[in-house]
């Protein structure tokens, strides 16, 4: 689902060789997930009989700050920490939390994982992530270079290694 809460919202569903994009108004994330369940369990795009067949759900979270250096299972504490990090991604993290909370309502106890876009870049050394500004801005506000779109960079890097038939550890790539 895209553009949840806007009149231009839509759902794209692909399964069994059938792909469809349908305009639909989703005022809330919960309503959007309910439509996702409907698409997955009925019609030409049916791919499961019931949500109990889903093993896990992944959520892309834009900013994990310095708290999250890898993906993790979502707990109430993880959601609260993502909420605390919202000033670092005020347009994305709050919307991501809405999606996580709605998914919890719709999908119940299915395990959910947060995949942080900033995690890929978490191994940068301080000389690469510190800005030439007063150090107290980093200490008080967490102002530093984080790196974004890490999930995409990781995917492209691993695909390049696969294509080149080289271990990723031996490659120096620009993605």
Regions found by a protein language model. Name each.
Residues 1-65:
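N-terminal glycine/serine-rich phosphate-binding loop of ATP-dependent small-molecule kinases
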């Amino acid at each position: 689902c895209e553009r949840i809460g806007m009149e231009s919202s839509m759902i794209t569903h692909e399964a069994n060789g059938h792909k469809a994009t349908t305009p639909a108004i989703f005022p809330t994330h919960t309503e959007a997930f309910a439509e996702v369940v409907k698409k997955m369990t009925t019609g030409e795009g049916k791919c499961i009989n019931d949500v109990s067949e889903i093993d896990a759900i992944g959520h892309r979270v834009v900013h994990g700050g310095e708290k999250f250096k890898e993906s993790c299972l979502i707990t109430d504490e993880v959601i609260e920490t993502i909420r605390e990090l919202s000033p670092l991604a005020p347009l994305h993290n709050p919307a991501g939390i809405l999606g996580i909370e709605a998914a919890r309502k719709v999908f119940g106890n299915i395990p959910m994982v947060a995949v942080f876009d900033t995690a890929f870049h978490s191994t940068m050394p301080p000389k690469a992530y510190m800005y030439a500004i007063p150090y107290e801005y980093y200490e008080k506000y967490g102002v530093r270079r984080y790196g974004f779109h890490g999930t995409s960079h990781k995917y492209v890097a691993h695909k390049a290694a696969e294509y080149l038939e080289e271990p990723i550890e031996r490659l120096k790539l620009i993605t």
